[in-house]
Regions:
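N-terminal beta1-alpha1 cap of cysteine-dependent amidohydrolase-like domains
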Residues: 1-95, 100-155, 163-177, 181-197, ...
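An anion-binding catalytic pocket shared by soluble metabolic enzymes
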Residues: 160
Length: 232
């Protein structure tokens, strides 16, 4: 019998967070869909000084809940996952931090920053023009992208809980190398990215895991777990 799929859930768990309530349900539904056993482990960010649990996992999810208690640990983890080709999913804060990691360590924007935690440097992640706390909206996907393939659709209605996103002043410059912007809202603002040279590296500002609260599967969670199965 195959061993369970080991899943690292990186973030500072808060039982009142809607996304954190949804994640175990989304994982269970994805495991049932794929007919596999899973072994999820929440890893608080203060424990990221040691990446052993990350290395031993089959896939990593940087979950919502930023700013994290240990930002530097999160960025070290992101760089290792990106360079080590570990299947990765990021949602909400996980998306924001993945963008900053890429800007700093691939594009060389060493002063790339998040407006929620700094007032210096290039504010790659900046306040949204309208808050998306407990809001929903239509998201469109690039044809042929991993996100579109996972959804088997070019659009979806998705839920959010955030006040920050990609600064439009930097969105065009972020693309190139191996980062593709593959999801947008109806105004053309960035809502999802993926890396083309990675087995599975997808991050979205929306929280696809919330589908589980409506007794629906999250296509991205299923695709992330399938990528881990394919690589195992």
């Amino acid at each position: 019998m195959p061993l369970p799929l080991r899943l690292a859930l990186v973030g500072d768990y808060r039982p009142e967070a809607v996304a954190h309530q949804a994640i175990p349900l989304a994982l269970s539904r994805a495991a049932a869909h794929l007919a596999i056993d899973i072994e999820p482990e929440w890893i608080p960010t203060p424990e990221l000084g040691d990446l052993t649990a990350i290395r031993q996992s089959h896939a990593v999810w940087l979950v919502p809940g930023s700013p994290y208690k240990n930002d530097e640990g999160v960025f070290s983890m992101l760089r290792w996952v990106r360079e080590g080709e570990k299947p990765f999913l990021g949602s909400c804060g996980g998306f924001q931090y993945a963008v900053i990691d890429y800007a700093r360590h691939v594009l060389g924007w060493h002063d790339a920053n998040h407006a929620e935690t700094s007032d210096e440097g290039r504010m790659v992640i900046a306040p949204l023009s309208c808050s998306l706390v407990e809001q929903r909206g239509e998201v469109t996907f690039e044809p042929g992208s991993r996100i579109a393939t996972a959804y088997d659709s070019l659009s979806s209605d998705e839920g959010y809980h955030c006040n920050f996103g990609v600064n439009p002043d930097f969105s065009a410059a972020l693309e190139g190398n191996n980062l593709r912007i593959t999801a947008w809202d109806l105004n053309g603002d960035v809502r999802g990215i993926e890396l083309t040279d990675h087995p599975f590296y997808v991050a979205t500002l929306f929280q696809s895991e919330r589908a589980a609260l409506q007794d629906k599967d999250s296509p991205l969670v299923i695709a992330w777990m399938q990528a881990a199965l394919d690589q195992r």
